[in-house]
Amino acid sequence: MDIVRMGSVASGGGSVRRTASSWRGTSGRSDAFGRSVREEDDEEALKWAAIEKLPTYDRMRKGILTAGGVEEVDIGGLGLQERRNLIERLVRTAEEDNERFLLKLRDRMERVGIDNPTIEVRFENLSIDAEAYVGNRGIPTFTNFFSNKIMDVLSAMRIVSSGKRPISILHDISGIIRPGRMSLLLGPPGSGKTSLLLALAGKLDSTLKVSGRVTYNGHDMDEFVPQRTSAYIGQHDLHIGEMTVRETLAFSARCQGVGTRYDMLTELSRREKEASIKPDPDIDVYMKAISVEGQESVVTDYILKILGLEICADTMVGDAMIRGISGGQKKRVTTGEMLVGPAKALFMDEISTGLDSSTTYQIVNSLRQSVHILGGTALIALLQPAPETYDLFDDIVLLSEGQIVYQGPRENILEFFEAMGFKCPERKGVADFLQEVTSRKDQHQYWCRRDEPYRYISVNDFSEAFKEFHVGRNLGSELRVPFDRTRNHPAALTTSRYGISKMELTKACFSREWLLMKRNSFVYIFKILQLIILGSIGMTVFLRTKMHRRSVEDGAIFLGAMFLGLVTHLFNGFAELAMSIAKLPIFYKQRDLLFYPSWAYALPTWVLKIPISFLECAVWICMTYYVMGFDPNIERFFRHYVLLVLISQMASGLFRLLAALGREMVVADTFGSFAQLILLVLGGFLISRENIKKWWIWGYWSSPLMYAQNAIAVNEFLGHSWNKVVDPTQSNDTLGVQVLKVRGIFVDANWYWIGVGALLGYIMLFNILFILFLEWLDPLGKGQAVVSEEELREKHVNRTGENVELLTLGTDSQNSPSDANAGRGEITGADTRKRGMVLPFTPLSITFDNIRYSVDMPQEMKDKGVTEDRLLLLKGVSGAFRPGVLTALMGVSGAGKTTLMDVLAGRKTGGYIEGDISISGYPKKQETFARIAGYCEQNDIHSPHVTVYESLLYSAWLRLPSEVDSEARKMFVEEVMELVELTSLRGALVGLPGVNGLSTEQRKRLTIAVELVANPSIIFMDEPTSGLDARAAAIVMRTVRNTVDTGRTVVCTIHQPSIDIFEAFDELFLMKRGGEEIYVGPLGHNSCHLINYFEGIQGVRKIKDGYNPATWMLEVTTLAQEDILGINFAEVYRNSDLYQRNKTLISELSTPPPGSTDLHFPTQFSQPFFTQCMACLWKQHKSYWRNPSYTATRIFFTTVIALIFGTIFLNLGKKINKRLDLFNSLGSMYAAVLFIGIQNGQTVQPIVDVERTVFYREKAAGMYSALPYAFAQVLIEIPHIFLQTVVYGLIVYSLIGFDWTVEKFFWYMFFMFFTFMYFTFYGMMAVAMTPNSDIAAIVSTAFYCIWNIFAGFLIPRPRIPIWWRWYSWACPVAWTLYGLVASQYGDITNSTLEDGEVVQDYIRRYFGFRHDYLGYVATAVVGFAALFAFVFAFSIKVFNFQRR
């Protein structure tokens, strides 16, 4: 950004030390130093004169460093320490020195008459519209999924309209973002802030309808490259977890290049030379360093300093699997990533989320200095700016419902609203006021015309009134005069597409990929270990002493061994899929910001994986080639090796391509399975060439595996070992040729080279397509926004002010489930407060005395010399929380707020707790306490695929006493929804946080409601307002206040509240770092009690007028302040009257009131076991029905595979005249079982993983025991698997043409059903036994490979060496194939094979399958399903991977 324009010489500058004149000021020094200073000056002048004489190119790359002597340096060779020292001299502390530094940059430019390039951004009559499904059509259910897909196809063909409704995002807005001024973008959620920023940055989604124009300095977007002229900083922090903060910023700086800085510095240097001006040496070195390519690190160091990231510069960014920097630091990295570039206009979207107010203030202040001094352009959207941050801005843009309500100087905005009849209260932040004043629900409280009754002023009214207001009139007249294009600085707009040359881009991407491969080395080591294990199993199963060369059947076993090698390397490439998809979001972000083209990203990912293929294949072939007894000719050995390397590279290329095509794990997984299936089935091993139908023969000729298999078979069977004729009476062909002919493989030796050529062709093709798909495709959109009728109506009313009732006439009343209740809620709302809730509850207090909590000392602290065994986190904390009193639990990070709350609520899973906790005078018992307490966690964890109403009904069903009947329960849920303002969202899908469904603030309210429907007496809330904007925080606090007013005991931890939120609390429990309390007591009116207490302590600074007491209180009680004042605030509190008062209160509340009894419940859970099972099953049913990406995709995938199999193996079930026919039939069964089974096992894992997180919360809340949850999760799969089996079984059985007898059909369906079932349960079991679905996937995949070997297809059980035969009995897939083959062919005695052997005898001899054992086989298959389900349930009950 411009901050780097501070950085940008173009933009003006380099890191500066004092200008030449001010830098030396020797006059004031004593003569003792005079001589050495003069000598230094002379030396410097001589060196400078020498640099001046150099040609321009060299002059730009030489500078003078003055740290401890004068030294000429080569700019390209600055070391890390030299750079750090330079930045340290220029900007010692960002808060104090940054402004001075930037002024020096500007002064140097201005002294020789060079202006900084500036950009004025205008938008005129800008409108943006989207299309979305409204009401029930938008909810993704099983049926909607299919009907919407069909409608999309038909509407694309212009046959019908799609049924989507237009929704306006921005409506005819105009304005100017001026250079040199800081503009703040404010507006409630959904007002269109992000869309406006994206439109101005030229990054809008192509599916939106946009009208109007956006210009930079009068130039339209197509006249320059907006993505590089401006920088858009988004809300989402997408970074590669394995890179450090410094590496992330340095890579970004390297890709974005130096812009026009170099040309401007050349011009600056020329003018200074002509005018004989000598610049400040440090400034000169900095400006040269940030203008010469290859020295990005100087810019990086400067930005790290400005953003306060130096402390974590060399820490990994981290992700879900790697521990890294904090959320607030990640947010700053996202900002820094764009600031290191030369962009001159900044559009920043909610850059303060997760930051405390002082950090936000410092970052915005640095941006402000840059914008003011270097003439940058900045429009910044902030969520909840503190008053001091708000005051840093010059202009305010206020959006509401897609219209501009105000745009102009900050000083005039309150004047405008007062003219409209609204006044900001004294103790209210202006930014908070502005976000609420346009909202229909909040507006009335700010009405200030006492002589007139309040009337609702709509957004349209505000917008029209602003055009008549003097600020609006000036803006209008300015917009009517076009920008004078002659004023445009030639360096202002960027016209080159990328920041550096193609060669440099390639180098940058190569070095990053190499770094990531080193960081991810464990993945490659793990893959090699996996290959060693599989190789060991393979070579001991196909051991050469058991591998004979006597007959064609022996040849088939060798083919199985070769096929195992090919398939292993094919599957080994599957890891590329997940690794590529994980990096795609970051790739799309950087591609769209024009960091690099797609080919520069794709080349390193391909080229650097080639050595890994060589290594993996070398490990495999060295282990298996001679041990398995392949032809011992060294040339054939190397040919075999080359083929494996090519297969490995082909597989990697294919899976990378599928990742780029699928772009999402579930979709790409499905594509990956399809691809593997087609490759394998049509590769010539499962079904031979002559049996492939003519409509599928193209698949055979286009399968890379066919070429690989032909080449590898020809290489082996035309070798010396197979060069013998077994039975001249039958055939003169050698044994090798006979094997090839029987399996339908070409016998020409040239097929080896044809195979090599084809594989090389595929490698090139897949990698080129990978590059093209990366270039052409955009990331998959988020789940379509689902808009309810209510929301649409609400938007319309807010915008126009029309009466709601008028609107209902024209709408389809059946569309939304909540329409019927909308009116009812409005009426009951008013009188609910008066009469209390439908269900009574007992108000209870909670007291705790001298609570100490400790954990085992972490090993790293012991390594640093700490001798204690335990680390104390809470040091004797005492307090009391009472009914009807709202208590805030506050303190700096690390004070132990959440720890105390977890201890009181009984949520800790480890550690040591001491002290007394009592509930209304009786000792706390966790079993009964869970029934009367609610806990709202900071992370809003809910099942994503149920609606708001269903979430609440489910919670009430399981947590209210069993005496409460269904009708009362529903009434109570309605009341709670009214209380927390969720009535209009009752039919909305909850969704996943940050992906789809409810907004953050709506999720917070749902979390509160889910606890409230349990009718608790005590509620704990962990940070209920974090991450919310001012208006959303106010709504949540209103919810909390309503809850307290019903007479409940409520405690909230809270982080940096605004004044009005802070003063909504009755009492404060303030803790300091280390787990001690320093103030426990009432706040008082305008926080007077709190202020008086701290101001009464000697040395504590007084609070300024209008300053936030919460911020002041945290500032004056820091550890640094304690050191300055020489006091301990915890000691001061323990010696105060307040402490004595609290101790008295605790002892009063710790004695039971006369006539009271202790809490007692006859059972641990409020509902009996059967009801728990029913409720869990009800929720699972709803979840599965509304999760078509899982359930519908599975049926779709199964149907397509069934049709493919059916048509490939058409009518082969009837052909049993040759051994090959039996192999083809077996091939169809083996492929189906393995592929659909593995697909089931893989896709169920993320579903169970998400639900398990919800299970941890619900179990801790005492809703149910682990078994009903596991029971429901197992049971809900059965009907879905049954439907899958019916679809698959009917299609395949009829098309392949198996024998249509009741018994055989029944057995086929039976084995398929239980096989799909045990695969699904196996996937679920792997999740239950591991911490997350990533590890579960690795664990389960390892077994799939082993099951593949022992399934009985690659090598039949009788041929498996005796030491491995036991495992074939423990392999579930072997039992399935036993059942399928024995039931279809094990009883055929009236048909013989080509050599006269009866089918039944052949099946028994070759495979070891007997028809009369079917009962045992069936029992075994059912047993595996039951075993996996049992282990799943057991693991869910026993293992808890949640650490608190």
UniProtKB/Swiss-Prot annotation:
Ranges for domain ABC transmembrane type-2 = 504-717, 1171-1385
Domain ABC transporter: residue ranges: 154-426, 846-1098
Q: Where are the transmembrane segments?
A: 522-542, 555-575, 610-630, 642-662, 667-687, 754-774, 1192-1212, 1220-1240, 1278-1298, 1305-1325, 1335-1355, 1362-1382, 1414-1434
Q: Name one GO cellular component term.
A: membrane
Primary localization class, coarse: membrane
Give the protein family. Belongs to the ABC transporter superfamily. ABCG family. PDR (TC 3.A.1.205) subfamily.
Tell me how this protein sits in the membrane: Multi-pass membrane protein
Question: Could you tell me which Gene3D superfamilies the record lists for this protein?
Answer: P-loop containing nucleotide triphosphate hydrolases
- The name on file for this protein is ABC transporter G family member 39
- Species: Oryza sativa subsp. japonica (Rice)
Top-level taxon of the source organism: Eukaryota
Give binding positions for ATP 1: G187, P188, P189, G190, S191, G192, K193, T194
- Which Gene Ontology molecular-function terms are recorded? ABC-type transporter activity; ATP binding; ATP hydrolysis activity
> Its function?
May be a general defense protein.
Q: Residues annotated as region Disordered?
A: 1-36
**What would be the name of the gene that encodes this protein?**
ABCG39
